[in-house]
Amino acid sequence: MARFRGSNWKKSRRLGISLSGTGKELEKRPYAPGQHGPNQRKKLSEYGLQLREKQKLRYLYGMTERQFRNTFDIAGKKFGVHGENFMILLASRLDAVVYSLGLARTRRQARQLVNHGHILVDGKRVDIPSYSVKPGQTISVREKSQKLNIIVESVEINNFVPEYLNFDADSLTGTFVRLPERSELPAEINEQLIVEYYSR
């Protein structure tokens, strides 16, 4: 299944979550798109709830179904709670870390920065968004890329960096200090529904 490339605004409203991370999609119209959006009261089945939760998280991270399922399966082989391990693995992706450091305003921008070779991990260029960052590794911006408007503007307006990360705005360098705790990750996601979806 290909990565979704349609309107993130419509998809955000349908799923009830900001896929861009800015929240603008839901400010004026916090309901599903379409003629009957504000009045839709259709009750989802158990399967429908599980599917919607899976889609919310998959679209949030901009992943294909295969990438998403593979990450889910890897999480299941780790010690601990499957759903929490899954959320932690997603938050450890390089594009997710770049976004959380404030180097990009949206996850899509963060993915593009990685794809285009603007990001370094421990001083070496890594252009794979799904690269799993390990505790202690440093994430920085290539010297030639440090004046890109997308990066400069993102850093200027960002006023929050999660506690599992350290970030120096002057050098545009961050450190993945430790694995995040579940409480530090998206609260609007019920990962147990996703576990149930894939356990059918």
Curated annotation (Swiss-Prot):
Entry GO terms, CC: small ribosomal subunit
Database matches in InterPro entries: Ribosomal_uS4, Ribosomal_uS4_bac-type, Ribosomal_uS4_CS, Ribosomal_uS4_N, S4_RNA-bd, S4_RNA-bd_sf
GO molecular function terms attached to this record: rRNA binding; structural constituent of ribosome
Keyword Transcription regulation tagged: no
Stated family: Belongs to the universal ribosomal protein uS4 family.
Subunit structure: Part of the 30S ribosomal subunit. Contacts protein S5. The interaction surface between S4 and S5 is involved in control of translational fidelity.
Protein name, entry field: Small ribosomal subunit protein uS4
Source organism: Staphylococcus aureus (strain NCTC 8325 / PS 47)
Upper classification of the organism: Bacteria, Bacillati, Bacillota, Bacilli, Bacillales
